[in-house]
Amino acid sequence: MIPVKPQIEPADFDDKVRKPGNAWLQAHPDVDPSKYRNFWTDCLEEMADLYSHTCAYLAIFFASVYGADSVDHFIPKSDPINGKKLAYEWSNYRFCCLGENRKKRTKVPPLDPFDPLMKQDSFFINFADGSIYPNPGYDETYKQKCWDTIEALQLDRPECRKMRKKHFKKYADNKVTLDDLKEDSPFVYQEVVRQGL
């Protein structure tokens, strides 16, 4: 995971998502959060374009044709304090692949890729096995936040390790250029550059 620059909400977001969403909530004040009307999907295509079809958590490009685009509510809809208030707010949305959204579920990881305080090099990659770990140069408190984020988002699961290792191998085997890697796998790209590979 690497920091992501938050994009400004689309001009029609208020009319397409926020207003109808909040009106629906007013009409259904006691509904279970899992049943909230998914007006956020009306901004999914624009969100994908604004974030270059790159998952906020895995930092990989994925094409919409696979049907894996999803909107994650960083603060989950089920949050007892802010869930309802943020359910239809652009600032609470993270563009991510569906699989990662399902892994996160209702967890709130300590590190948010949209947070300007998240450090660019929070995580390092061991390309021998594709594993990730906190940058050892940071203090114990920040490193623990990194570990807790890895756990909350399951960023070091076998599939993720395999993916990172595969992306690196394609670059190492000269099957893709550094520019291709930057576009398709920004986190792997960042680590290739940092490690001088």
Where are these regions (language model features)?
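Glycine-rich phosphate/pyrophosphate-binding loop shared by adenosine-nucleotide-utilizing enzymes
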Residues: 57
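Histidine-centered catalytic micro-motifs used for acid/base chemistry in nuclease
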Residues: 71-78
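Extended charged
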Residues: 1-48, 60-67, 83-94, 98-197
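Short acidic/polar micro-motifs at solvent-exposed secondary-structure junctions
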Residues: 51
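The −1 position to Zn-ligating cysteines in a subset of zinc-ribbon hairpins
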Residues: 54, 70, 96
